Amino acid sequence: MVQRKSNLHYNIYGKGIPVILVHGFGEDGSIWDNQVNFLKDYCKVIIPDLQGTRSSPLMEDKNTLTIEHMANDVKDLLDQENITQCILLGHSMGGYITLAFAEKYPNYLKGFGLIHSTAYADNEAKKVNRARGIEIIAEYGGYSFLKNTIPNLFGEVFKEGFSDAVDELIEKSKLFSNTSLQAYYHAMMVRPDRAFILKESQLPILIIAGTEDVAAPIDDLHEQAKLSATKYFHVLDGVGHMGMWEATKQVNEFILNFIENI
């Protein structure tokens, strides 16, 4: 493992085609540990911590951070490593960043993917919920907020059978400042719809969905998968928003198949 830091702290594992895995809201790069341990024998895996996460400082104000800022951070990472083409995969908020990157820097990509993520912008009800979340974080703290929301990300079978893993993710959430969490929520709330990227891109696109995912509903992802002619679309039965943990073997195989077929 090689540790590097630009604006972002990131780790590099293995050799070969560069594959960047971007974590989501309330997570850090360790969310991908199960994927790293598998994929590092097949490719160069790069795991950044987004700004405001762990050792990566928050560079923007909580009211000015955007998804595009975080996509630019990924571009800076690639430039620092002299990487001119990669595969970019994002989980949840990381998928929003991946789409913003695909819009702005398509020539850097051999392919990209959304793992439990959506190209749609927040609807009005979701924006209201985001705004309320920002208020709750300010009033009660980020840890309290995530302690209540994280369990809802998992499918029922995993949540009941692997409560220790759910507790582990909750415990890691203590690392986040209130400001960082509010900044992420604001960035997600104001992001534009990027469904057109799926329709217009000629790049291979990976989409992984869970039938019990309440954050990235399966019906939305079915609709979005139909937009792309170059898609790899996989559905995880009985899985919520966290397939990297809930269905590790399947997710690893889906990602490797995507890499090997590009």
Language model regions located:
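Active-site loop/oxyanion-hole signature of alpha/beta-hydrolase fold enzymes
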Residues: 6-8, 13, 36-37, 43-89, ...
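Short beta-strand element of the alpha/beta-hydrolase
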Residues: 17-24
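Serine-hydrolase catalytic-loop signature spanning alpha/beta hydrolases and amidase-signature enzymes
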Residues: 24-34, 45
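Gly/Ala-rich beta-loop-alpha elbow adjacent to hydrolase catalytic centers
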Residues: 90-94, 98
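Flexible "cap/lid" loop of the alpha/beta hydrolase fold
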Residues: 99-104, 108-147, 153
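Conserved alpha/beta-hydrolase catalytic His-Asp/Glu region
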Residues: 122-128, 140-200
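Conserved loop-alpha-helix segment in the C-terminal half of the alpha/beta-hydrolase fold
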Residues: 202-239, 245
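Post-His helix in hydrolase/transferase enzymes
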Residues: 245-259
